[in-house]
Amino acid sequence: MDTLLRQIPKVDDLLRLPALNTLAAEAGTSAVTEAVRRTLDRLRADILVGTVTELPSTEALCAQISASCRASRLPSLRGVINATGIVLHTNLGRACLSDRALAAARGVSQGYSTLEYDLTAGERGQRYAHVEPLLCRLTGAEAAMVANNNAAAVLLILSALTAGGEVITSRGELVEIGGSFRMPDVMAACGAVLREVGSTNKTHLSDYANAISEQTRALLKVHTSNYRIVGFTESVSPAALAELGRSRSIPVIEDLGSGCLVDLAPLGLRDEPTVQASVKAGVDVLSFSGDKLLGGPQAGIIVGKRRCIDLLKRHPLARALRVDKLTLAALEATLQAYVDGTALQEIPVLSMLAQTPEELRQRAESLCRRMGESGVTAEVVSTENPVGGGAVPTQTLHSFAVAVVPRDSAAALEAQLRQRPVPIIVRIAHDRCLLDMRTLFPADLDEILQAFRETAS
């Protein structure tokens, strides 16, 4: 061991090698020097624990240094290939934007824009003017605005409408979303007092009515988008709650969570309420996400009665939680696709959800055949996947995947694919790596084939 440690090359000696001089010209001397030190530190540690008993050749060492250097220069936030079959994969960024949305964001980011400028009047304008008319047209609401995500939207609504008073909501709707974001905690942060009514599995309209007092500021309904209570249950519809609110002059707020502008039942996904239905039911103000079933950028979209939305726009938090020009441009383009009637074809989330099992099976068979020609052992298998993003929690989508039989272990192959310059994220089932076709773009296939050619060689 001591002999091996003494034989480890010096940093300066390695930096003088032609291969690393070439690398330094590309990446910079500082980056290459750091890569050399990292590689030697790792080699030294491997020798000490006994996993390395022979020094690598100079060529092999240079290859390790080069790989380390290039890996360190890759951006931390970068694109991946989602082969999990989960369309709204929260950890992988949820909704993929449409080409139209990407072009719109690029168009306003490369130069100046009309973010807060009224071209007709030649004076300062309102940033929400770019999306408010579209949102009102699509949902039937009187007014609209946008915060930077749905949690922010809920925070703004409760702060503006309920601070210092009570908010009545059902015990069965006290949700927690990702990151321990709990509705009771949000109310406390807004200065509102939570008034729970009903039970976990059953809440009646009379429970809300009996709880109303002089301190009541709002009635809150929360769509349990990431879980369902089934069996002996009862809940109050938005329409019934809105009628109660009107009769007592109390605003009704609804957090729709995922948010949906089209009926997903034809795609096999039922019981996901649409925004239009809640607006038609008379809910005063409601919020939903932009980057889930809508298929746009991250945003907390708020629509409702003008008197409520105006209060929100004037609240100090509105400025702190407002969205930027890239988000507004991408959201406007996404909404325009709905207005044009091309959302199902244009928006990746919807087009992925709309793929039939037969289409997915044919795509899987084609990929499996091409992988077999590259020496990869694989077969086509049937899969069931959740939509993801906390949407439609009790239903799955039938799909097909290419199941790859690894040389060693599925875990080792999964890690290898994950560490590529363009990471490929797969699922493991029965010690095989699954490439689910539902979330694979046509442009992903060549990269996948190249990755498996390299692993097979």
What is each residue range found by the language model?
Residues 8-9, 27, 81-85, 294-297, ...:
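Short Gly/Ser/Thr- and Asp/Glu-enriched loop/turn motifs at secondary-structure junctions
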Residues 41, 83-84, 94-120:
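Glycine-rich phosphate-binding segment of PLP-dependent enzymes
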Residues 76-77, 144, 288, 422-427:
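A short linear hydrophobic-aromatic micro-motif
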Residues 121-338, 371-372, 451:
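Conserved PLP-enzyme active-site core in the AAT-like
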Residues 307, 315-316, 323-371, 381-384, ...:
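Structural motif of enzymes handling amino- and sulfur-group chemistry
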Residues 52-97, 103-104:
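Long amphipathic N-terminal alpha/beta scaffold segment
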